[in-house]
Amino acid sequence: MSCPVIELTQQLIRRPSLSPDDAGCQALLIKRLQAIGFTVERMDFADTQNFWAWRGQGETLAFAGHTDVVPPGDADRWINPPFEPTIRDGMLFGRGAADMKGSLAAMVVAAERFVAQHPNHTGRLAFLITSDEEASAHNGTVKVVDALMARNERLDYCLVGEPSSIEVVGDVVKNGRRGSLTCNLTIHGVQGHVAYPHLADNPVHRAAPFLNELVAIEWDQGNEFFPATSMQIANIQAGTGSNNVIPGELFVQFNFRFSTELTDEMIKAQVLALLEKHQLRYTVDWWLSGQPFLTARGKLVDAVVNAVEHYNEIKPQLLTTGGTSDGRFIARMGAQVVELGPVNATIHKINECVNAADLQLLARMYQRIMEQLVA
């Protein structure tokens, strides 16, 4: 199958870019973009490679994505080696095919076609690419956004190529994401012998009523755009492993995925009030990995919906479900942010794959979005 989108996707898959190692993917993309007149600025931080590229001036539409992938797992369980792209029955297999090297290829090919047809386009077309989205994400998009904001770069619209679709390309478009807040809580007691509980203070026993009340809280009911806030205990640990020792500490880690009905400060205040109510001795550490954001109907959402309807003859659902993405950082620039990408059924799995025809379709959708916003 000879198709520029498929060929570029295959070239990217062959580069084993385990986060945050770019493995040469960005050099390939940069070469293609420079060939059509893009100015490219490398913005590397620590072990992470990033670049910001632009062509033209004025109202700005950026395409954002990541070259890094998650580990493939047991390579013997793949139907073909994970970094040797293979097409079987119309499906392109390989680590990163769906998340998100296929999207990157579709973006670049769409830009090539767009520039060929609109060499003097009126707006600015840009790319923001990182090699660290799947791992810590500390030196990727967030650092680039900080640098761009420090020099007052303009960013009006951003299309993130994350695999948003469920069954067919464009059936789901993400126009926002929930916030994510993690609490690392240690409850302090006094270690001792289980036969002498009066000489100890069991933090597990003390924390049990608190945890029972915590998990029963209805944080909010969500709203038109977001499901209700969810709190889940992710890790809990206490004890020495011995059956005759009362533990001295209990560690509990829990995560909130929260809607725009709440702020992180509101959540923190409620948790701390509950800790005080139960008279617990504790230390607490919070990690806010992203605020919730929402892009309401406007020029970007309308352009994306139009492109999907034009090429796939379906009306996409606008959802905010799922995990976080780098869109949470880009939204800080005041940009309208929308995610549109391939079907996500196999992302992070053994035998990750994407329908090859879907990538061709995605490139056409991306090009139409460019034409509506910056032609």
UniProtKB/Swiss-Prot annotation:
Zn(2+) 2 binds at D99, E134, H348. Binds 2 Zn(2+) or Co(2+) ions per subunit. The active site is at D68, E133 (proton acceptor). InterPro entries: ArgE/DapE_CS, Bact_exopeptidase_dim_dom, DapE_proteobac, Peptidase_M20, Peptidase_M20_dimer, Peptidase_M20A. Zn(2+) 1 binds at H66, D99, E162. It catalyses: N-succinyl-(2S,6S)-2,6-diaminopimelate + H2O = (2S,6S)-2,6-diaminopimelate + succinate. GO terms for molecular function: acetylornithine deacetylase activity; cobalt ion binding; succinyl-diaminopimelate desuccinylase activity; zinc ion binding. Pathway: Amino-acid biosynthesis; L-lysine biosynthesis via DAP pathway; LL-2,6-diaminopimelate from (S)-tetrahydrodipicolinate (succinylase route): step 3/3. Pfam families: M20_dimer, Peptidase_M20. Keywords: Amino-acid biosynthesis, Cobalt, Diaminopimelate biosynthesis, Hydrolase, Lysine biosynthesis, Metal-binding, Zinc. Its EC number is 3.5.1.18. SUPFAM superfamilies: Bacterial exopeptidase dimerisation domain (SSF55031), Zn-dependent exopeptidases (SSF53187). Disulfide bonds: none annotated. The keyword Metal-binding applies. GO terms for biological process: diaminopimelate biosynthetic process; L-arginine biosynthetic process; lysine biosynthetic process via diaminopimelate. It comes from the Bacteria. Its cofactor is Zn(2+); Co(2+). PROSITE patterns: ARGE_DAPE_CPG2_1, ARGE_DAPE_CPG2_2. Catalyzes the hydrolysis of N-succinyl-L,L-diaminopimelic acid (SDAP), forming succinate and LL-2,6-diaminopimelate (DAP), an intermediate involved in the bacterial biosynthesis of lysine and meso-diaminopimelic acid, an essential component of bacterial cell walls. Belongs to the peptidase M20A family. DapE subfamily. PANTHER family: ACETYLORNITHINE DEACETYLASE, N-ACETYL-L-CITRULLINE DEACETYLASE. Homodimer. This is Succinyl-diaminopimelate desuccinylase. It comes from Escherichia fergusonii (strain ATCC 35469 / DSM 13698 / CCUG 18766 / IAM 14443 / JCM 21226 / LMG 7866 / NBRC 102419 / NCTC 12128 / CDC 0568-73). The lineage of its organism: Bacteria, Pseudomonadati, Pseudomonadota, Gammaproteobacteria, Enterobacterales. The gene is dapE.
